[in-house]
């Protein structure tokens, strides 16, 4: 693998920023809070800029990172959006309203924006170093964007119209066009009004094509044409670097049009890099994560089941122009990849090439919102944590759960490892309940269910297994695995399948479950032996009735 893409991007950007000659550089990202604020939005609009910022800060640059929420965009009222309301039909009245004026469909926040931002905004500091400031276009329209409109856009609106018409193709704007969309005082829409006249430089007269109303509005209660608005945000904030999604990256597309408008108005557009979407795979199907389409999971939901370092690792492992597919059933695999990079970082393991070793070590370093641990921490396989969590139950994760991990030799005594283990047990338990494959999702009933006992074919084998396990010299995964292999010697493949079917019926009450050796090693030996004997005896009794 070559030099890490983050370092390559930093090297390219460093010279370009120096040419701008500023004391402080502004990095920005942009989000429209049109619905579900999913983890895909962290990739390009938050984490990419954060990684570059932090590296430039190490080189002596002063950088301020912003995240702009486009809260004045019109609410489109897609089916998925309307279904968030108790009465989707009644919600049609909000179509065209500014996003921050649409009510919260669940009634727990002040607005649509506040509701859906609540699962994203408060968690930015968990996924990053926290040095990111959030601004909204609503705030900007009351200040710098208003100034941008009155001093730069309106005096040159005919030149702006000609630039935009180059990119529009169909339905070019006619002479006299005013690039403002006032909010209608009667119906509340901002997507159906036509600005007719500027009054005294501060107000605008308009007509609404939806309800027919004519009236006046302040400029700050209006919205710019979106291409001009993008350039206006750059100017208002003084943006020097801003990543953008692939939908804006087409040659001659929206990014190019905003950049041309910026140069027309006398300032340079920010440096940028485009990024690919993040997709979600579930049930064998893949779909791009979508805010207004309500596809994906939020940062809050991710933190329920995995550490922020894991998502950062996934994102920084791949260049931003590479598509990333997240599958929540694969969380254990993501942890395994992260742990391998951790071993490589600490020199415990090497990859197949020097280049790959360096790349993975660097990716691991970037995966930490702060600094990596000072020494190699314990590495608890995620699937093991899921097994332990289900064995002990949610109330005993930090007591019995930690103790079982220690007995299994999976947990050290350093503060970092213990904190990680506590968090991991909680996350793995929730993952097992929500996303785990069927064979990893189980409960240990107090007593084997009667229907399971009736299905046990050879209770004598379970009793013999109990004797073998009782005499295992060391209750560890490796020794248990060895004992199980030896116990199954001489069985045909079909006999071995039936034996394990009986085993799982006795232990978890189902004909399948997690791999036997890890499962047993994380349970008490005495419980396992007693359980197998009890299941064998009860099974024989039921069959003898």
Curated annotation (Swiss-Prot):
Q: Which BP terms in the Gene Ontology apply to this protein?
A: lysyl-tRNA aminoacylation
Protein family per UniProt: Belongs to the class-I aminoacyl-tRNA synthetase family.
- Placement of sequence motif 'KMSKS' region: 288-292
Gene name tied to this protein: lysS
Which GO molecular function terms does the record list?
Answer: ATP binding; lysine-tRNA ligase activity; tRNA binding
UniProt GO cellular component terms: cytoplasm
E.C. number, please? Answer: 6.1.1.6
Q: Which reaction does it catalyse?
A: tRNA(Lys) + L-lysine + ATP = L-lysyl-tRNA(Lys) + AMP + diphosphate
Indicate what this protein is called per its UniProt record: Lysine--tRNA ligase
Keywords carried by this UniProt record = Aminoacyl-tRNA synthetase, ATP-binding, Cytoplasm, Ligase, Nucleotide-binding, Protein biosynthesis
